[in-house]
């Protein structure tokens, strides 16, 4: 693993007890979460992907979550999410897909997802049979693409994602059309006032998942705009963010056993 110099010093530790939650989700209060800059090679065999890895410390192997960020805002808000997942007892990889720009073609997205998944599977402290993906905004589209391409993913969580690509986006597979390829528990967390991904579209996605008999849950937050869960996004809403991460933690604890830590590791 080659360390990169980008915003965070490699190996720096963060104490995150303030975000440990209310006991309804997995986690340990006041633990040190190490975040380091890493790089790995895309599935195309040539492109380097600068990313961040959060490690919960203690004894592994751990379940792991691949974080697929949105377009807007700096990495900082997503690094905080990786730290939070580390605090819950997961290894978390913040995938640096924006090295491709803000709207890469699907072929590059799939290549880079392959590189990220290969990196996670080969990480010595990760249990390769316990992998999940969190997608935010545009990364929510990528999360559904990952679920179709990687059958070893056990859980998918999408925060303020899309049922259909924005009109200004590059043409590609529609999330709505990826529904049939989702065979694992899916949680969608969405605002009723999402100006980029209308509520009606997401309700249509919900109905399709139900018609297909998919193990999907949809949670809607009244009056909340796009980007509500990410602190550095213009649409951030603290109450909805807290509620959505409580839901995500509950969902992981239910569908990805072994995330909670016990005994001397608490």
Predicted feature locations:
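C-terminal catalytic histidine-bearing segment of alpha/beta-hydrolase fold enzymes
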Residues: 215-266
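Gly/Ala-rich beta-loop-alpha elbow adjacent to hydrolase catalytic centers
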Residues: 135-139, 143
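A conserved short beta-strand
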Residues: 152-163
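Short beta-strand immediately N-terminal to the catalytic nucleophile in serine-hydrolase-like folds
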Residues: 133-135, 159, 189
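Short beta-strand/loop motif that positions the catalytic acidic residue
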Residues: 182, 188-190, 194
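Conserved alpha/beta-hydrolase "acid-adjacent" motif
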Residues: 196-201
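Alpha/beta-hydrolase fold nucleophile elbow
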Residues: 125-136
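Serine-hydrolase catalytic machinery in alpha/beta-hydrolase-like enzymes
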Residues: 37-126, 174, 227-233
């Amino acid at each position: 693993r080659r360390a990169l110099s980008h915003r965070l010093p490699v190996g720096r530790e963060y104490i995150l007890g303030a975000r440990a939650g209310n006991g309804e989700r997995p986690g340990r209060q006041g633990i040190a979460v190490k975040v380091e800059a890493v790089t790995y090679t895309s599935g195309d065999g040539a492109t380097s992907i600068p990313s961040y890895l959060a490690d919960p410390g203690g004894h592994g192997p751990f379940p792991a979550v691949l974080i697929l960020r949105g377009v807007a805002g700096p990495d900082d808000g997503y690094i905080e999410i990786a730290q939070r997942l580390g605090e819950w007892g997961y290894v978390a990889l913040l995938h640096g897909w924006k090295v491709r720009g803000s709207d890469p073609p699907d072929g590059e997205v799939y290549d880079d997802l392959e590189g990220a998944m290969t990196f996670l599977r080969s990480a010595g402290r990760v249990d390769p049979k316990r992998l999940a993906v969190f997608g935010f905004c545009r990364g929510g589209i990528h999360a559904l693409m990952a679920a179709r391409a990687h059958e070893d993913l056990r859980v998918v969580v999408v925060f303020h994602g899309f049922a259909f690509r924005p009109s200004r986006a590059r043409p590609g597979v529609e999330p709505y059309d990826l529904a049939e390829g989702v065979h694992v528990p899916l949680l969608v967390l969405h605002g009723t006032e999402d100006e980029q991904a209308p509520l009606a579209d997401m309700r249509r996605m919900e109905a399709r998942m139900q018609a297909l008999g998919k193990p999907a849950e949809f949670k809607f937050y009244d009056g909340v705009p796009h980007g509500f869960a990410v602190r550095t996004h213009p649409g951030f809403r603290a109450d909805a963010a807290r509620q959505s991460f409580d839901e995500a933690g509950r969902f992981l604890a239910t569908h990805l056993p072994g995330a909670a830590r016990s005994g001397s590791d608490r």
